[in-house]
Amino acid sequence: MPFTQKEITYLRAQGYGRLATVGAHGEPHNVPVSFEIDEERGTIEITGRDMGRSRKFRNVAKNDRVAFVVDDVPCRDPEVVRAVVIHGTAQALPTGGRERRPHCADEMIRIHPRRIVTWGIEGDLSTGVHARDITAEDGGRR
């Protein structure tokens, strides 16, 4: 499993993140999305109402490199920022979305983490930034 228990708890509490894909001409495309974490697979699952026709879906089908960010600012004074940043590869899948969310299209995007960077979710901000590469032994896809 590539995610720690604290990462899973944080991600489950959020529900929205930003997915960055690579466009047809190499330009970044960054959009807000709803998501779920699949603990069994160790992946992030992204669904949507018109997923199969979306630019993000087409981008992933052509170039599987993605970044995904989930963050929040639970306190402004003093400022507290928490985040999970995932770099990895993604699949544009023709089925599975409707199983997860009946109101969504059947197409979905599945993210396989290769690197995870976090800050602020450990409960102690003095611990700083945590970064690690995900190996096949961790449940990552190579």
UniProtKB/Swiss-Prot annotation:
UniProt pathway: Antibiotic biosynthesis; oxytetracycline biosynthesis
InterPro entries with a match to the protein in the record: F420H2_bilvrd_red/Heme_oxyg, MSMEG_5819/OxyR, Pyridox_Oxase_N, Split_barrel_FMN-bd
A Gene Ontology cellular-component term: cytosol
GO MF assignments: coenzyme F420 binding; oxidoreductase activity, acting on the CH-CH group of donors
EC number: 1.3.98.4
UniProt keywords, alphabetically: Antibiotic biosynthesis, Oxidoreductase
Catalyses which reaction(s): tetracycline + oxidized coenzyme F420-(gamma-L-Glu)(n) + H(+) = 5a,11a-dehydrotetracycline + reduced coenzyme F420-(gamma-L-Glu)(n); oxytetracycline + oxidized coenzyme F420-(gamma-L-Glu)(n) + H(+) = 5a,11a-dehydrooxytetracycline + reduced coenzyme F420-(gamma-L-Glu)(n)
UniProt note: phenotype after gene disruption: Cells lacking this gene are unable to produce oxytetracycline.
Keyword flag Oxidoreductase: yes
GO biological process, alphabetically ordered: antibiotic biosynthetic process
EC primary class: oxidoreductase
Matches recorded under NCBIfam families: PPOX_MSMEG_5819
Entry's family note: Belongs to the pyridoxamine 5'-phosphate oxidase family.
Function: Involved in the biosynthesis of the antibiotics tetracycline and oxytetracycline. Catalyzes the C(5) reduction of 5a,11a-dehydrooxytetracycline to yield oxytetracycline as a major product. Also catalyzes the C(12) reduction of 5a,11a-dehydrotetracycline (12-dehydrotetracycline) to produce tetracycline as a minor product.
Name this polypeptide is given: 5a,11a-dehydrotetracycline/5a,11a-dehydrooxytetracycline reductase
Organism listed in the record: Streptomyces rimosus subsp. rimosus (strain ATCC 10970 / DSM 40260 / JCM 4667 / NRRL 2234)
